[in-house]
């Protein structure tokens, strides 16, 4: 797949991820061979840091099916800990109050994301009038 996707994992969907042995159900549509291989790197890194990753792949539709699933889970009060979401949709979820609090902003500041991430990408990862990171690039 040669498309350039601005794909993120909105860790802030669920505000209470414990630092000691965090568990995260991750909704995504990276299901093809190459995508799944790339995702395995993220899973391994999370596991290496003591995390327990529960995979929730949703195939088909270039992410449309996954977004329908995510919306249904949010409405049911059962949002996953993290989800792959495309840029502008992040602000839409924020406008609905789904992402708050912006837990990932502290990580972004500590790691200096504003110096590492282009402004164009960062604008899709920030909420609260584009002042705080609410998603990871």
Question: Which positions does each model-derived feature cover?
Answer:
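Positively charged n-region of N-terminal signal peptides that target proteins for export
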Residues: 1-4
């Amino acid at each position: 797949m040669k498309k350039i996707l601005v794909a993120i994992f909105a860790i802030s969907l669920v505000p209470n991820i414990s630092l000691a042995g965090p568990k995260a159900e991750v909704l995504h549509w990276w299901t093809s061979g190459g995508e799944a291989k790339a995702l395995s790197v993220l899973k391994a890194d999370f596991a290496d840091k003591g995390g327990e990753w529960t995979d929730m792949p949703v195939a088909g539709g270039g992410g449309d099916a996954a977004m329908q699933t995510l919306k249904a889970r949010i409405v049911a009060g059962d949002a996953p800990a993290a989800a792959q979401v495309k840029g502008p949709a992040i602000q839409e979820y924020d406008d609905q109050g789904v992402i708050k609090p912006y837990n990932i902003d502290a990580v972004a500041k500590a790691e200096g994301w504003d110096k590492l991430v282009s402004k164009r990408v960062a604008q899709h990862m920030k909420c609260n009038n584009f002042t705080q990171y609410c998603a990871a690039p």
